[in-house]
Amino acid sequence: MAAPVVPSELLDPLIEWLKIPSVSTDPQDPVPIKEAAEWVQEKITAAGGTADLVDAGGNPLVVGHFKANKPDAKTVLIYGHYDVQDPEPLGLWTTPPFEPTIRGDRLYARGASDDKGNFWPLLYAACEMAKAGELGINVRVLCEGEEERGSRNTNDWLAADNEPTDACIIYDSGRMGRAAAITIGGRGIITTRVTVRTGERDLHSGLFGGSVPNAIHELTRVLTHVLPGPDGILRDELRAGIIGAPAAERERWASAIPGEKLIELAGGTPLSSTSGDRYYEQNFWEPSLDVDEIRSGSPRTVIPCEATAFISVRLAPEQRNEDILSALKDVITSVLPGYASVRFDDDAGCDAASFDPEHPVLLAARRGFTRAIGEECQLMRIGGTLPLLDVLAKRGIPTVLTGFATLVDNIHGPDESYPLESITMGAAGGRALFEELAKL
């Protein structure tokens, strides 16, 4: 089968943008960060809009605006991010991460799916409609450079923003098969860095092995008290506040791709015999805890006096991030032996967010996507977290979280890619979405 054809005016700029190594995770280079932001700014102004690079305390925010072709039009905010994850390990890439390459029906590059390749078609649709005088809504553009670092500055900026906004569209999610999908909710999150210390300095294991505590040993013992059980379920203190999935959601799971298949497609291994059956409940309506990183020691046969773990907990709807972070710290502190100390750093978190699928904005989006893609638009949840959603929900802004990523895009990993057809689907869907929202 021939690869889908993407118009050059849609594909070529994306390839240009993907060549910019706008890595925001440490260590970051401010030059490509600014270059990627200026790329977005130039695209907006070239289409007749206005755009500024705003200093919100970190990497520049691109804040743009396209005026509607009629008075008293509604205002819609579109959001994306220009920053990307570190591409290491480079040796696992088939082609260099910042040399975009088409192989088969996919475009390979860091950021191809998350989020440059996903967001650009939406921005492209706004630019093209603005140039043709076809925008029946005011479009505000917010494109940030710190999403991969938690979006703290962006969240603060958006929470303080007082511009009237009737809806928000976010292209940073995925589709279901060939159908567009709208995400009506995601989980919350807490993160913290836990450091256990057992002495003043590292000591020689030949002189003190078995006589003094090893910080790695103590950290791992502590972690066993907060890790999930063999079925993936967390201890009661970390499950406080969960409400379970409503009947309507459970009915949707019956027609969804089986959990076992999703795990297989992603290249994972089921944790237990029930992981497939419980996939949707576990990832949408239950909390989960992961140790994402452990740092300590060296191969020098010394006993480390300090060990650090980075822990993340995905929160179920209705769980409060402050409560679960406090419970996590209480458990860790309570099981620590008297000869060790613990420190918590870099605490962060946000609550889960949900949006009413029957809101007029979401109904309009569903109509637009169904018309543009030719398949009935689906509703879904995600197990991930977009901190911006919490801010938007608290501001009462109905949000269409969508996009055209797929399960096999390998975001954040080597050989990240994006289907060529997703690029054209995203542009067509964006145009239809703007048209339907203009009718409200």
Regions inferred by a protein language model and the residue ranges of each:
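Active-site metal-coordination/substrate-binding segment of hydrolases
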Residues: 73-143, 425
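An extended, acidic, His-containing surface patch that forms the Zn2+-binding/catalytic region
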Residues: 71, 85, 151, 177-178, ...
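Histidine/acidic-residue-rich, glycine-tolerant segments that coordinate divalent metal ions
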Residues: 136-214
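A short core secondary-structure module
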Residues: 209-231
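N-terminal helical capping/dimerization or prosegment-like subdomains
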Residues: 1-90, 306-310, 322-325
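A generic structural motif
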Residues: 113, 200, 313-321, 350
